[in-house]
Each structure stands twice: as structure tokens, then as C-alpha cells.
């Protein structure tokens, strides 16, 4: 991921709001990069620019050598939000395979990928459970599995453990590091916690 002279200004009734200004950054393949800073400093906005969910006012950003829109079409990244965002009427396995259904994978491939990513996040055997039957931490692991299901190179994570208690968060951080070591994904991780960023990251970006 490469950003050069990236600016993003929002127009509001109270005047312009400069969400990002002169951002220059390189994230290399296999890096685990954490973004920290106070609320409103642009951490989530930058992640949304990577994902093509926000359009910069000026400057350039590329993902695997592609524009953010091209990278999205190429399935270059998975996105994990602070809320797990699981559909309550679908089983855990059904939630994880949803993007695979949308992308047109055949049923055999869907089943194989769901099993593989559930094993990766230590949710083996929970595929027929519904979200309400799982703890908050387990639901978030299912959300991570869903983002991994289509085998994207990059994982974008926006405060994925921010709503969880400290003991659960520490456990999930350990699991995330093991997952990163096994998959060699590139991870961009937004957090408010300096200790969490120090524990997880190969690089920390202060915004």
C-alpha cells in the first residue's frame, strides 16, 4: 500500500474539515502496521481510503499497484469492522460463506474455504451455531474468518477488539499474531491502545 501527498477534506456547514493532510506512507507486503492517535485524527478515514470507501481530495494511493477501486474488484483486501456485523438469521458458517456466494464460488469450494478459515480462527465445529450463541470475542473471530474467506492479500482492521473487555482482547491479540504468522497477510490495524499497537506491530503510524 502506497500513499503519496494524500489529502482529504470534508465540506460541512461549519466549513471545511481536514481529515487527512500530506499523508506519505508505504506498507510493504507482510507488514503488520498499526495506526494510533486521538479520535478524529483520520485513522479510520485512511483505512476507508485504502478500501475505496472515501475518495481523497488530492494525492495518490495504490493497493498492490492498483487504484483502490481496482483493488476492491480484484478482491485484494478483507475488511474487519469494530462490530462483527454478523447476520443473526444465518449460521456462523453461513455468514462466513456469504462473500463467497456473492462472488460465485461453487458450493464445494465454499465449504472447503469456510472449514479452512474457521480452523484458522479456532472456531472449528461452530459452523452451525448462530451468532447469538457465541460470545462477543467468538463473533469477532467469525468476522475475521469472513474477511479471510476469499484469500485476500491484505486485511484491514478498524478497532476490531475495541468493544471487548481487556482479558478477551488480549487473548484475541495473541490469536491474531498467530494467524498473521501462519498466513503472512499484510495487516493494517486501527487502535486507540498504544500497548496493543506495540504488542502487535512491525510498524506503528502515529496520526
Tell where the protein language model's regions lie, with residue ranges:
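The feature captures the beta-strand-to-loop junction immediately N-terminal to the Walker
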Residues: 36-38
Amino acid at each position: 500500500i502506497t500513499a503519496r501527498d494524500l489529502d482529504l477534506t470534508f465540506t460541512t456547514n461549519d466549513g471545511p474539515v481536514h481529515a487527512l493532510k500530506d499523508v506519505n506512507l508505504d506498507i510493504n507486503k507482510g507488514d503488520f502496521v498499526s495506526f494510533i492517535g486521538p479520535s478524529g485524527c483520520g485513522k479510520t478515514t485512511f483505512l476507508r481510503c485504502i478500501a475505496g470507501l472515501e475518495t481523497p481530495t488530492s494525492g495518490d494511493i495504490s493497493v498492490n499497484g492498483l487504484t483502490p477501486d481496482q483493488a476492491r474488484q480484484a478482491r485484494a483486501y478483507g475488511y474487519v469492522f469494530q462490530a462483527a456485523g454478523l447476520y443473526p438469521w444465518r449460521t456462523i458458517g453461513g455468514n462466513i460463506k456469504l462473500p463467497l456466494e456473492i462472488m460465485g464460488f461453487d458450493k464445494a469450494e465454499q465449504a472447503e474455504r469456510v472449514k479452512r478459515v474457521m480452523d484458522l480462527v479456532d472456531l472449528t465445529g461452530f459452523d452451525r451455531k448462530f451468532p447469538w450463541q457465541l460470545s462477543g470475542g467468538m463473533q469477532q473471530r467469525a468476522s475475521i474468518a469472513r474477511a479471510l474467506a476469499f484469500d485476500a492479500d491484505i486485511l484491514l482492521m478498524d478497532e476490531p477488539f475495541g468493544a471487548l473487555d481487556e482479558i478477551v482482547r488480549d487473548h484475541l491479540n495473541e490469536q491474531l499474531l498467530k494467524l498473521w504468522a501462519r498466513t503472512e497477510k499484510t495487516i493494517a490495524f486501527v487502535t486507540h491502545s498504544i500497548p496493543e499497537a506495540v504488542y502487535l506491530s512491525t510498524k506503528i503510524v502515529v496520526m
